[in-house]
Amino acid sequence: MDKRITLIGSKIAKTGNEFIYCGVLEECSECRFKKICHDGLIVGKRYRIVSVRSAKHPCIAYGDGVKVIEVEPSNNFTILIESKKALEGLTLSHSDIQCNNILCKYYNLCHSEGMPEKYKIMELHEKIKCPKGNSLIKATVSTIN
């Protein structure tokens, strides 16, 4: 695994949480922790927190401070896919479900950020009752390198 040490806001520094790295903020330019926060992370990539250290450090961007965490690239994602494409072991090219209902409780699963271009369906879960009538299934998928 490609594990890295970085910093993240104390409130979201929990083992198992995932985040998408969005790049260096303007507030970070003069910070003494800039290098540890940003070096080695790839913009747009999703990371999973594998451990959290107890020490808390001050941060201008995160008013509640930051904690040191160990992260690894997240290779498994839970998303919604069209039922007609739902077959375990199948390799697919990613495309979001066509829907603009941002208030839908499934929106983030239909429009999952940080998704790889291609993935393999690892496990199928329950059928989803889509408010727009789309035939969808929740699935765990894995990145294909």
Swiss-Prot record:
InterPro entries tied to this protein: UPF0179
Domain of life: Archaea
Family recorded in the similarity comment: Belongs to the UPF0179 family.
Name of the featured protein: UPF0179 protein Maeo_1037
Organism of derivation: Methanococcus aeolicus (strain ATCC BAA-1280 / DSM 17508 / OCM 812 / Nankai-3)
